[in-house]
Amino acid sequence: MKKLIISLFAVLGLCGSSCSYLDMSPDLGIQEEDIFTSYNNTWQYFQTVYYREFSGHAAGSTVRYRNIFMAAPMIMDMNENRYSFYVFTDAADTGRKGGLSVKKGSFNTTFQQFFCNDAPKGRPLFQVMFEIIRICNKTIANVDRMADATPEQHDDLLGQAHFIRGFAYFTLCCYFGGMPYMTETLGADDEWDLPRLSAYETFVRCAEDFGTAYEYMKAAGTLRRDGLPGTEGNLTGEGARYPNGVTAKAMQGRALLFAASKLNNRYGESDWRAAAEVCAEAITLAGEWGYSMEPIKNWSKNFTVGPRTNEQLWAMAHLGKSNGKNGRTSCLLAQPQNNHSKGAGTCPTQNYVDKFETKWGDPLETEDDRRAAVAAGHYDDQNPYANRDPRFDLTVVHDGMKVEGSAGSDVINIYRKQDGTYPTSKVSKNNRSFGWPRYTSTTAGHSNTGYYLRKYWDGKYNTSYLQIDPIIRVAELYLNYAEAVNEYAGPQGTAGGLALTALDAVNKVRERAGMPNVQERFTADRDTFRPRIYNERNVELAYEGHHYFRDSRRWRTCEQSMTQKLYGMDIELVGGKKKYTRFELEDARQPTWKPCMYYFPLPADEASKMKNFVNNDYWD
């Protein structure tokens, strides 16, 4: 029987490499009763959404993921091209020039293959997400046939199936827009050539799935799968790999927030109110079940060291190694940090660095902002990294900073000497070159902006450590709530029976970081407060989870951010003193914006398989 079950798992809903993501043929040639009559067999079938991998791929290869974690932003970034999605925005540059074609508005064949090809170097996101959706649909349709499942097992399995289906559709909608939302396994006589829903409709359907998942998990007693803080089992056990009821409610709020956003909004303030109510529920629920923001001294544990904190509602941990034997981290960490000869890295632009306020809460994004901060005695453009938001040093590697792997008086050196050479930096007793002549290589991963990414780096060299993708965490819950409430009720508005105002929610995130409240001049009304909400989100969630890539699109701010000039920071030692000069990046590294760039196009050969499936516009 065991041998039979294994062979059935290999066929039932688990398409091979030749299976199209739109191939919904139900003729699988097996008897389903061999799977769904027992809880153990049904669970073994369903849990492939978490554990399934590509066959024939080398152990340790990130491309082995053929499960829901392929949708995890960090796994998507750990690709053969070594570009994170942040280099497709104004937030970052990359050492390897090839990744900049997307920023220039060219979604070429290479990147189409990256998203859709079932190849060792590909991320066939469409195929895998629709395979997962099919597994969820078959599980939901057959779960009542289990003869030996307890009510808790039955409800938890249904909850997970609804959650994973919603998460798969949410992922597809973020990158490609609205989808046909299939909730049943289609039969031979069913209509499977379905039209696309709008993005608004798709996000609302995702929210419905997340809401259903919450109700089932509540009934199953799986609102949290590990022990509460201070009790045995906290942050331990295999159960944390699976989403729980708190996560489902949080994702329901996020999906409704995306539906309400400017890119998708259909019903005005009522969409925002609906999102705010659920976001309020998520905050309350998270608190009841022991989730809270970590102290700022532990903030980085959300991203490295880990694998778990009580701030993470759901996270994916990946073992990275900062030496030349592991190129997977090179999408985030540039060559001086990981010694991978082709490491591209995510190198923050000066534009994004300017989003980090002074420690007094002064904005620095515009020349007028900086002049005002200088006049207040809060900013010095020749000592630009002093007196900044504490999260700046935890997010960005800049000249003159110390990292954990340095010793004594050792600091990171990015400046240039007057003779044109660059001093090395000592990290874990190794000499590393962070400063480098700009634009000298199209493949080397040295920064052209004067900055490197700190958030996912343990500050050491030649060490193994966990890099963590916090798919959703508590700080985001407050930011989601603040944004939704502000849009229908202003800074002093509330929702969901909470006394917490939109302004309070933002200030709570700032307080954890050691920052003062938002300055009063920015809290008069919805319109003046909105930019500070956006900025707080950009700072707190910087370079994680594709947040900025997604947020700048749903906010429709790309028309401004992707048409501005991008800058770096040049630092030269002159007469024993460092001189800081902003400079424009070369034209080849400047962004372009076209309306079609809100979504990626599907490959024509896939989209054409369905007559009613209208493709997105091509970028080229």
PLM region spans:
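Conserved, well-structured interaction surfaces
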Residues: 38-44, 51-57, 91-177, 190-204, ...
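Long, intrinsically disordered, low-complexity segments
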Residues: 18-21, 86, 129-132, 207, ...
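Membrane-proximal, proline-rich intrinsically disordered regions
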Residues: 19-76, 383-386, 607-620
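Glycine-rich, aromatic-lined ligand/substrate-binding cores of catalytic
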Residues: 310, 314-431
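C-terminal substrate/ligand-recognition segments
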Residues: 385-509
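Short coil/turn linking the two alpha-helices of tandem helical-hairpin repeats
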Residues: 173-174, 178-180, 221, 258-267, ...
